[in-house]
Regions:
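Basic-flanked hydrophobic alpha-helices used for secretion and membrane insertion
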Residues: 97-238
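Membrane-proximal extracellular/periplasmic loop immediately following the first transmembrane helix
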Residues: 45-98, 110
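C-terminal membrane-exit region of the final transmembrane helix in multipass inner-membrane proteins
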Residues: 3, 336-365
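Alpha-helical transmembrane segments
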Residues: 5, 9, 14-15, 27-55, ...
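Short cytoplasmic-facing helical segments at TM-TM junctions of multi-pass membrane proteins
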Residues: 265-292, 362-364
Length: 365
């Protein structure tokens, strides 16, 4: 990479500019990816904490997508699933988004209740204490963010839909559709659901049993339900589907722009060096050596720019995560960085045609 390194030393300003541009693009992609991860966590971390093999919801009408907020599992559908996979493997779950109040403070929350079956603890999502107090008819459990927003501690009284509940425990960090979670007993949730215009039927069934897609399709057809598994479970939260789709498209566009910018720079730079490359060809340099030189040059720029961007994200990410939903880990930093490096090399590869087509006779003109 002798020639490439000499080019970098000779044109420090140009290479510094493109390196800074790559770093800024890495920062944009990295921060957007971290924000996407943080928003996803604030959207569906409670759903993920259920660790269900499948989440059963009522079948949507027409071309609509299945949504937990509009799903209502009829008793006969629940009974059919229990008969097919075992009653102990099916847990009814109810979710209601509503306002909770304490003194003059009111905030939006998601009430989560579950029937017998899987042990979901206090119902407040991940990071619950092992000795968390389970909700009862008059007691609720608050996630940490719900308690902070309402300004309450264990033993305080909050009001939900005109009824007072005692805070039995503050535990867990769960969110549902960007609002903090409050765990409620199954009987209290059913009563509240009916009082606020609902049916009292569960929004979903958690299936903790491995069944094939064919078996699930057969049960769904008989019960008029849908039962997504894996990542598709998270799409049952409507805001997650639109949010991740929008942010994912932005990340993809930024990565494509990065490849275009790097490719354009090296294309122009290679065209400006056409005569130098022709001289090297005339002196006997093989094309393979010139190609390695050009690829090494672009890899150097990408490695420095992407590495600097990742370093800044790793330093700044933990600091901003306290005020905005931001996740800083290998999936939101290293993975986008490696992908940007790969796309940048692909973009730079389009400039290699000028290297392979350089005419040694130009050096004699």
């Amino acid at each position: 990479m002798f020639l490439g390194w000499r080019d970098v030393l000779h044109a420090k300003g140009r290479f510094a500019i493109i390196t800074v541009v790559v770093m800024l693009m890495t920062l944009l992609v990295g921060f957007l990816t971290g924000l996407t991860g943080g928003l996803a966590g604030a959207n569906v971390d409670t759903v993920r904490s259920w660790k269900a093999d499948r989440i059963v919801m009522s079948a949507p009408n027409g071309s609509q997508d299945a949504s937990m907020s509009t799903s209502s599992i009829a008793p006969d559908a629940q009974q059919h699933w229990e008969d097919q996979v075992g009653r102990s493997n099916v847990t009814a779950v109810g979710v209601t988004q509503i306002a909770a109040a304490h003194d003059d403070v009111t905030t939006g929350v998601a009430l989560v209740a579950h029937g017998p079956g899987a042990d979901l603890g206090a119902g407040t999502g991940p990071n619950q204490a092992d000795d968390a107090v389970a909700p009862s008819a008059t007691n609720v459990a608050l996630s940490e963010d719900a308690a902070d927003e309402l300004g309450v501690e264990a033993g305080a009284t909050i009001t939900i839909a005109g009824h007072e509940f005692t805070v039995a425990d503050v535990t867990g960090t769960g969110h549902y559709s960007h609002v903090p979670v409050i765990g409620m007993s199954w009987s209290a949730w059913q009563e509240l659901s009916e009082r606020t215009g609902g049916t009292g039927h569960p929004n979903a069934l958690l299936v903790h049993a491995e069944i094939s897609d064919d078996e699930a399709a057969s049960i769904n057809a008989a019960a008029n339900t849908v039962s997504p598994a894996g990542f598709e479970q998270l799409l049952a939260v409507g805001s997650f589907r639109s949010e991740v789709g929008s942010l994912g498209m932005m990340i993809g566009m930024l990565m494509a722009i990065s490849a275009l910018v790097v490719g354009a720079f090296f294309t122009v730079w290679t065209l400006q060096r056409t005569r130098d490359i022709a001289v090297m060809r005339a002196l006997g340099s093989p094309v393979s050596a010139l190609l390695r030189d050009a690829i090494g040059q672009s890899l150097l720029v990408l490695a420095v720019g992407v590495g600097a961007g990742i370093g800044i994200i790793m330093l700044v990410g933990p600091a901003i995560s306290a005020s905005v939903p931001f996740v800083s880990n290998w999936l939101t930093t290293l993975a986008p960085g490696l992908l940007m490096t790969l796309l940048g090399l692909i973009g730079a590869a389009f400039a290699l045609r000028s290297v392979t087509k350089a005419d040694p006779m130009q050096a004699l003109n």
